[in-house]
Amino acid sequence: LPSLIHFAACAPATGRAMEIAMSSQREIRLNAFDMNCVGHQSPGLWAHPRDRSWQYKDLEYWVDLARLLERGKFDGLFIADVLGIYDVLNGSGDAAIRQATQVPVNDPLALITPMALVTEHLGFGLTASLSFEHPYPFARRLSTLDHLTKGRVGWNIVTSYLESGARNIGQQTQTDHDTRYDYADEYLQVIYKLLEGSWEDGAVLRDRERRIFSDPRKIHPINHQGQFFSVPGIHLCEPSPQRTPVLYQAGASSRGKQFAAGHAECVFVAAPSKVLLKKTVADIRRRAAEAGRDPHSILIFNLQTVIVGDTDREAQAKWQEYKQYVSYEGALALLSGWTGIDFGQYQPDQVLKYLHTNAIQSAVEAFSTADPNRQWTVQALADWAGIGGFGPLVVGSAQTVADELQSWVEETDVDGFNLAYAVTHETF
């Protein structure tokens, strides 16, 4: 694996990232969390008069956001993605379509290059599912982005969970949860061989006098033959600044955490409480140690939504204003897709019990076990997830928010946060 790399660094940052992670004076890492769609994880808030997410298809929207985040010293922009539609609610995608619940959604890859052009330090975390593209062409995409961003790109590795996505690439049903991670393990082995092993250092000569650009003796076919992939050839790209981009992993099931312990440099989780987050962080670090890694070589980010005002009262008023725009139907469409549970079959006051599904098992566990004393109803769940998704919400003045984020770091050992928005770009 490549060494730990800090997204925001403008110089080689391996030592600095490790130093910060291990020091007593910890730096809180902040990523903005967005998606190439309307509203992302705040269904209905696209109708708010100050929201710009409906402009997602305009390049100016993304360039403005990149400049804002660079000015605000964010470490990176974490770009989510989904290839499929949320069609579990009432067995139809109609609710998602009506409420613009992550549909329409454009490809995230094309956003990165123009945003990199107007920034110097901002990192970019690209979500790309390894379920829908062969590793050979995808390795070329990663190298290309790493070249064009001068080493500021990361890859959020997801295995995909929507049945609709599987059906639209010719599969009758989604592959079993754990089998997808077995597939992912081999996928990563192919990626490593292509990015790290195919081209030696010094293979690119650019020798004008001898008219030799690259030395074929230093470029090697990977000759991979495995259960899922056969890749005999060389990587098509010369080595990029990082070779392998920063690797994110965003699943918190037991198998997902095992995968993260072996591969990830950064892990994205969505724990709604400090108790659950502390347990999750400790589990990930324990698994990393068992895999022979320094437990703190993995940076762990929790989903968080912040609503800030000049005073606590102003922030609370802003939150109350935002809640008027939340779409209950859109929230249920998200929740149904995330968990595989059709919440349309329940009344709003229906109390839910723990349910095992094949879709985002960690999300099901989160709302079922986060607060054992709370009776979770469909309405309560929709209210909770309606602004920012499954993560906790922090509302208050700048001082209140800073103190609260610091307390999460100190009490849970988390390294930072992926900050979702209620209204964009206002939230950021």
How would you describe each model-predicted region?
Residues G15-F428:
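N-terminal glycine-rich cofactor-binding segment that shapes the pocket for flavin-like pterin cofactors
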Residues L1-L4:
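Leucine-biased recognition of intrinsically disordered, low-complexity hydrophobic segments
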